[in-house]
From Swiss-Prot:
The keyword Oxidoreductase applies. GO terms for biological process: L-lysine catabolic process. The lineage of its organism: Bacteria, Pseudomonadati, Pseudomonadota, Gammaproteobacteria, Enterobacterales. It is an enzyme of class 1 (oxidoreductase). Its cofactor is Fe(2+). InterPro entries: AlphaKG_dependent_hydroxylases, GlaH, TauD-like_sf. This is Glutarate 2-hydroxylase. PANTHER family: GAMMA-BUTYROBETAINE HYDROXYLASE-RELATED (PTHR10696), TAUD_TFDA-LIKE DOMAIN-CONTAINING PROTEIN (PTHR10696:SF56). Keywords: Dioxygenase, Iron, Metal-binding, Oxidoreductase. Pathway: Amino-acid degradation. One of its GO terms (molecular function) is oxidoreductase activity, acting on paired donors, with incorporation or reduction of molecular oxygen, with 2-oxoglutarate as one donor, and the other dehydrogenated. Acts as an alpha-ketoglutarate-dependent dioxygenase catalyzing hydroxylation of glutarate (GA) to L-2-hydroxyglutarate (L2HG). Functions in a L-lysine degradation pathway that proceeds via cadaverine, glutarate and L-2-hydroxyglutarate.
Length: 325
């Protein structure tokens, strides 16, 4: 997929109502569901959690679960089971989530609270060494001199999984749009592992199971290398992946050329989804069988995008990596 390309949308299906929210397959793919909290639910949630600033959620980790309970109660306790079912379902495993009425950078704290509540209904977000918190906020601008592609606006950030260079289990990734100014392009890119045309070819290769070294640049604040293969299997023997092209360190010619072929095969897939994510919305995906990236932006001197991410483990699943826990 080339820069600024988008999957042609199909007519949006009717949303299925639940207490406090609705859900429907997205226009881009039936694997990606769109979940929308009603304005009433969003308002009531923010009122009930107003007593806790985000700093309280940072300092007292149990409050992250409490705000999740408040949100689930407002949704008739039907939200949590639906989130768990969707995220663990191999046929789906991805959500685009929106709280009606949260759509401006002035509501950044409210955005963090809502995303935190959702994430802690399915598990717990890991410590993010880059920010020193359970979440990270970062800004993309027109000019960037950082040491990874995370903030570089004028190139595609290739498809990858999160958590490749840390020891913590990374089952889910949450990516929220907090602000956007003078932006064109930069859609989120998603690829479901089972839709990748070359999965069988690379999964069956002997190098797929060879432990490789993964090392992060200084900005990630992680100094210890980790070792694991690119592919593994879940508890049912299905392929799962832990891969990012920037941080894998091949030890020899064989590994290096194999990784180069794998990267090309991912980036040229015809099944990559291009997903616009408006301010206030967030993607929540199963990191074991979804890869994600970002298309490039059109240059603008005042370009600005602020994102928030959380990544963590499922508390209700044993479908982790089986051979390299």
């Amino acid at each position: 997929m080339n820069a600024l390309t988008a999957v042609k949308p199909t007519p949006a299906p009717l949303a299925q109502p639940y207490p406090g929210f609705s859900i429907a397959p997205s226009a881009q793919s039936p694997r990606l569901l769109e979940l929308t909290f009603s304005a009433e639910t969003t308002t009531q949630f923010l009122q009930q959690v107003a007593q806790w600033p985000v700093q309280a959620l940072e300092y007292k980790s149990f409050l992250r679960f409490q705000v999740g309970k408040i949100l689930d109660d407002l949704c008739g306790n039907q939200l949590q089971p639906l989130l768990i079912k969707t995220l663990l379902d191999r046929a789906e495993g991805a959500l685009l989530i929106n709280g009606e009425g949260i759509d401006n950078v002035s509501q950044a704290e409210e955005m963090v609270k809502l995303a935190t509540a959702v994430a802690h209904l399915i598990g717990r977000s890991n410590f993010d060494a880059m920010s020193g918190q359970y979440y990270a906020r970062f800004v993309v601008k027109n000019v960037d001199n950082s040491d990874s592609y995370l903030r570089q606006p004028h190139r595609v950030m290739e498809l990858h999984n999160d958590g490749t260079y840390v020891e913590e289990q990374t089952d889910y990734v949450l990516m929220m749009k907090i602000d956007e100014q003078n932006m064109q392009g930069g859609n989120s890119l998603l690829l479901h592992l089972d839709d990748w045309e070359h999965l069988d070819e690379f999964f069956r290769d002997p190098l797929a199971r060879r432990p490789m070294r993964w090392a992060a640049p200084p900005s990630k604040n992680v100094s210890k290398d980790v070792f694991h293969p690119v592919f593994d299997v879940d508890s049912l023997g299905r392929p799962v992946m832990r891969y990012i092209d920037q941080f894998v360190q091949p030890k020899d010619f064989e590994e290096g050329t194999w990784l180069s072929r794998l990267s090309d095969a991912l980036e040229t897939s015809k099944n990559i989804l291009s997903i616009p994510v408006p301010v206030g919305k967030f993607l929540l995906i199963n990191n074991l069988f979804w890869l994600h990236g970002r298309d490039r932006f059109t240059p603008h001197p005042d370009l600005r995008r602020e994102l928030m991410r959380q990544r963590g483990y499922f508390a209700y699943s044993t479908n982790h990596y089986q051979t390299h826990q």
